[in-house]
Amino acid sequence: MKLPLKWLKDYVDYNVTHKEFASKMLLRGFEVADIIPEMKVSNVVVCTITHIEQHPNAERLRVCNIDIGAENELVIVTNATNVYEGCQVPVALDGAILADGTEIKPTKMRGVLSSGMFCGGAELGINDVEYEGAGADSVLILNDGTKYTNGMRIQEALGLDDVIFDIELTPNRPDCQSIIGLCREAASALGQKFHEPVIKPVAGSGSAADYAKVTVLNPNLCPRYCARVVTDLKIEPSPKWMQLRLKLSGIRPINNIVDITNYVLLEYGHPMHAFDLACIEDAHIVVRNAVEGEVVTTLDGKQRAVTPDMLLIADPHKGVGIAGIMGGLNSEITGNTKVTLFESAVFNAANIRRTTQKLHHSTDSSARFTKGVEAVNAELAVNRAIELVDILGAGRVIGSMIDVCNADISEKVVNADVCHINRILNTKLSGESMAELLSSISIPAEVCENKLRIKVPHFRTDIEDGIETDWDIAEEVGRLYGYDNIEPTLMHGDSFQGRLSRSVIIEDRVKDTMAAMGFMELYNYNFTSPQEYDLLLIPENDEKRNTVRLQNPFGEDQSLMRTTLIGGLLRTMRTNCNKKSGHGRFFEIGNVHFNNPDLPEERKMLGIIAYGGTGNVRNAENFFTLKGIIEKLFEILGIENARFERGGGAYLHPGQKAVVSIDGEVIGEMGCTHPRVEKNFGLSCSAYLAEIDFNKLAAHTNNSRKYRPLPKFPIVPRDIAVVVDRNIEAQTVIDIINTAKTQVIVENAKVFDVYYPKEAGDKGIPEGKKSMAFSFELRSDERTLTDEDINRSVNT
């Protein structure tokens, strides 16, 4: 926020150096990021050209006599063709320093002594923003209608003799997005009285309701809408003092009516807009949501497609502005405007923020609305605009204001505990001292039984009533009292030994285990595209289609919150394969989100992908290596009773997939990619995937360590082959082996081979059957097993 020094002096008695002011403001929480001095030229003054004649020795040079307010006129030799007798121009005299550091000395030019040099905008270091015409590559003609005193410093003539403080603001202080708000804080920092502005009422004649009508269809997004009407407009440039202040604040002057709205924006921090009432059908302002497919052409000439969640200012038939962002081109103030309606409204901050983001268009108005404006300020702003209309004689003011108010504008009173504030700040201030400090920034407070009863001014929207009140007031008291005045003390309080939660411990263990098995961790975006679910062959009625749509996505390809990690894993694989990295092992622990009627549900998932190989078939990734990886992870986590059974998602190969369960609860699925999925994602080879519900996995994790003595007697390994029906799963046979009732202990049963006969009778295997080979271990805690014990157990 730019604060011109001269504007500051309208409200505050300024009695310090600029650096001291910056230091004092910093201690109050406002950093002065830059101090911009006045125009950096010296000994450049205004002159009037009294006579011009051709140079006697040069065809392209002219000799000018100039009046600088001294007794004798000076002579300037120039090649400028745009100067003429009677015009006023800047002239650099003997010893002048220009913006680029050039020093000017009297010089003979083809036999005629020139006492200086006429200056253009480039020599003065200014452009068209500071003064119209300064951007031209010629001498600057001072033709703004003002008769300047000859010899006047050019800084004063152009109004660029002001110092600008560029002040950084924090988001919690929207009241300081105004000159008045900053000056209020500056007065307190300097220990001076703040000269509160008083708006002079302009009664006018008639009633605004006779000229216009306002209807607010969505009071939640527009709690207050104030309007006043001015007729018999005289559209002309605003006075120089107003133009200078706008320019110094970075705003281009347009005409008196538009400049008034911008001036009030800077002064009070409340955005306004002026409509040409003749362009509003039936003179009826309607504040409504946009309709699907509606387009509004804004003042910058761009057509902007608006959506139903955006708020528009409209008439009964068309939009005439995007609320809080920018007015419409079809109702702008022009030289032919005779009647205007001044709008001063309050719009919902969150809605304006979303609209700004969707339209990718931010303005000075939207910047203030997104931080929040105050309902009381709407009336003050429109009345200040009317006062300026009266001061400038810009038109005939119509009497009463139109006010559609659904906002709470009642006075807010809060109570704060003096003792608690002192404990927070480690101070010993009395309630009276605190009240005096608060009064310096226009916050009235009374002391009653060690309590502060505070009437919160309308512009301090950051002070809330509730459990945070003491902290809000302590913040104000602390910065006003001065943090450098608070005695430093050592921190004290109860300390507790920190510890990681069970979930974090398990997550770290999973990450360590996966890394030990050669996996690298991924962090993919939580966003995905609607098309990805089609690429993964996910059925329309599948839970994974129950997605959360983003209101303001980066693009359509990132418009949904993901419900599975699989898409991101496959995209990572594709990227790596395209970069000639044909082998990889990756895992990701991330959140997925499902759309529920009340609130979206967030789940943490573990995703695993392995693909490619070293060229050796035995070392290539396959279904069984992935199964072994998952089993090893379960072993590290102390999980028993895990089962792998037929089933799994549609994105997995029908013959190479399984659901994973623990103690009967399904926690995930694993398998090889479906050939169609490989084609959809453009994969060069198959991938082996697993997705496991991390929270369910953690629930079955056993952190306790059980002591198991080493076997006293030898373990005997055995292999068997059995012929079973083709639809019999290996897990079914493993369960039979592990639960066989024998006199010895049978454990660690695993399948290591499956053979399907090529034809009936092949290797003695009947039609419809298959051969499966299993390994297992036999042992006894009491004795060494004999061949008879072993054979009896195997035959069982």
Regions found by a protein language model. Give the residues of each.
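A carboxyl-terminal module marker
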Residues: 2, 23, 439-443, 447, ...
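Mobile "lid/hinge" segments at catalytic clefts and subdomain interfaces of large enzymes
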Residues: 110-142, 155-159, 163, 311-411, ...
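Short, hydrophobic beta-strand segments
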Residues: 2-7, 161-170, 223-231, 364-371, ...
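Extended, well-folded interaction surfaces typified by the phenylalanyl-tRNA synthetase beta subunit core
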Residues: 181, 414-582, 746, 775-785, ...
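Phosphate-backbone binding interfaces of nucleic-acid-interacting proteins
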Residues: 1-206, 341, 358, 364, ...
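Beta-rich nucleic-acid/ligand-interaction surfaces
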Residues: 40-43, 201-204, 455, 495-500, ...
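Glycine/proline-enriched, intrinsically flexible loops and inter-domain linkers
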Residues: 5, 54, 62, 190, ...
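Conserved mixed alpha/beta core segments that line enzyme active sites in large multi-domain catalysts
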Residues: 48-76, 150, 244, 255, ...
